[in-house]
Amino acid sequence: MAERSDFWGTCQGGVSLTFDDGMGCHLDRVVPALDERGLRGSFYLLPRGDDWEDRLAPWREVAAAGHEIGNHTLSHTCSGNYTGVRGGLELSSLERIEDDILQAQQRLLPLAPHQDRWTFCYPCYCTFVGQGRGRRSYVPVVARHFLAGRAGGEYGFGNHPATVDLACFWAQTAERMGAFEMIGLAEELTHRGQWVVFVFHAIDGSRLSVASEDFLALLNFLARRRDSIRTATVAEIAGDISHYQAVTGQQRSPSTP
């Protein structure tokens, strides 16, 4: 309870809504729904391909409206264990993944030139390169360049502002969740004074999807509860947590916003 009153002020906890891969449904359906309710989301984009400039151009307006643009790497390299094809993170290196991340960042910067705090999203929630005895975490790479990095997490657990490692904070994958499950997680975990981060991919899609009626019900709940549950971008809440950990002397990961 002390953590709730110390960090969250008049609110009981916080929620961030994150969206991966810069999908068309995010532009067509998610952004308008958020704007209608006065909510802001964090969108993690992949600036890859020869057409990346044209494809990402609409996101300039999204960023200008107050939504967060985040880095999801250039190549979206995940574990080769997902596909059975060699060439994934197991065969990568810290130098290679850092170069990939920084190339993506150079392409993303013009989309949101006003953003002074950038956050990162680990593709497929994988935070390593190499394998066996040569396996290494690339969380320190992310901590070097970003305010925060979104990883995976255990179901039913959020992030405690006093102790969360911002370079590898936890999130709840929302695919296949119904409205009451998402609302229940938001209600219970914020009641405990935690920061709840939801991960969305498709809305009404064929893969990693959430039904639009369930998604909108969550947004309506958060809009109604804005006085008791703070809904803000990852950069906003992570920035406040970083300051809170610094002034209270709590352990925190070094980062360069």
Question: What is each model feature region?
Answer:
Residues 2-9, 41, 51, 146-163, ...:
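C-terminal domain-boundary segment and adjacent tail
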Residues 24, 76, 126, 205, ...:
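Active-site micro-motifs of SAM-dependent methyltransferase domains
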Residues 1-27:
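Boundary/entry segment of secreted carbohydrate-active catalytic domains
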